[in-house]
Amino acid sequence: MQTRNTFSWIREEITRSISVSLIIYIITWASISSAYPIFAQQNYENPREATGRIVCANCHLASKPVDIEVPQAVLPDTVFEAVVKIPYDMQLKQVLANGKKGALNVGAVLILPEGFELAPPDRISPEMKEKIGNLSFQNYRPNKKNILVIGPVPGQKYSEITFPILAPDPATNKDVHFLKYPLYVGGNRGRGQIYPDGSKSNNTVYNATAGGIISKILRKEKGGYEITIVDASNERQVIDIIPRGLELLVSEGESIKLDQPLTSNPNVGGFGQGDAEIVLQDPLRVQGLLFFLASVILAQIFLVLKKKQFEKVQLSEMNF
């Protein structure tokens, strides 16, 4: 009886431990996976401001390149690739929220013309699915199917992100026309420097909030520092809190000025935005162009044959 109770207790403890671990994993993964897009989605109705600036730049302060490749023209009701490239040095490591170093993640927002949207799974070819990998795209808003977001995802695997896009058909959507359309993209690598509420992350420089002498630097138990600055003129003390993961540039007894950097800049990432143009091509116009080109080629052939025939007639008359 004693043995049975012991085994039962062990089984319950193991089950409880596994359950807790799974819950922690799910919560952590959910918070990480939704972190980047949800900041913009919660605070901005549209990710592109009237000035053309994409709102992700409000949190990711460093400027880095981003590129997008799309076909020059597409036919209605066809699926095409929009490839967003977010280049960076794969050897770089960033400061994570816990103060440790880790690999960079990437994220992107793609703003398509009205009517263009994410292609349904049954319209995506096997070749395109292989390029997409395990990426899961989402609409910026339920009613904004033309704005897509993705991230954060591992940068080492997805520095090139392939969006499968379905072109609209003017025959079924009267708001769409056969025209040249602009599209816009924003892409980031690494964590941001500022949260939407205006507070700093631990992925940026921390400056002195007062000038004076550093009287004390206290290293906190869970990481980070408390720097006490004494103003020599009035003996007023100011304590600056430095989060974990940052490298100090100052020491006790040092004289510093207002806004002087207390830490080095840990940020190795950044945000960039770009644009491209795509033509929604009328199939009848393409057919007309092909017919015209065929007519020109046939006319050239007939002209050459006629010239050959004329030369033969002239040659025969001369021989006669």
Curated annotation (Swiss-Prot):
Lineage: Eukaryota, Viridiplantae, Streptophyta, Embryophyta, Tracheophyta
Keywords, comma-separated and alphabetical: Chloroplast, Electron transport, Heme, Iron, Membrane, Metal-binding, Photosynthesis, Plastid, Signal, Thylakoid, Transmembrane, Transmembrane helix, Transport
Function, in words: Component of the cytochrome b6-f complex, which mediates electron transfer between photosystem II (PSII) and photosystem I (PSI), cyclic electron flow around PSI, and state transitions.
Transmembrane stretches, start-end: 286-306
Gene Ontology CC annotations of this record: chloroplast thylakoid membrane
Cofactor binding: number and manner: Binds 1 heme group covalently.
Membrane topology, record value: Single-pass membrane protein
InterPro entries named among the record's database cross-references: Cyt-f_TM, Cyt_f, Cyt_f_lg_dom, Cyt_f_lg_dom_sf, Rudment_hybrid_motif
Subunit structure: The 4 large subunits of the cytochrome b6-f complex are cytochrome b6, subunit IV (17 kDa polypeptide, petD), cytochrome f and the Rieske protein, while the 4 small subunits are PetG, PetL, PetM and PetN. The complex functions as a dimer.
Family annotation (SUPFAM superfamilies): Cytochrome f subunit of the cytochrome b6f complex, transmembrane anchor, Cytochrome f, large domain, Rudiment single hybrid motif
Similarity annotation: Belongs to the cytochrome f family.
Name of the protein: Cytochrome f
Subcellular location: Plastid, Chloroplast thylakoid membrane
An example Gene Ontology biological process: photosynthesis
Pfam family, one: Apocytochr_F_C
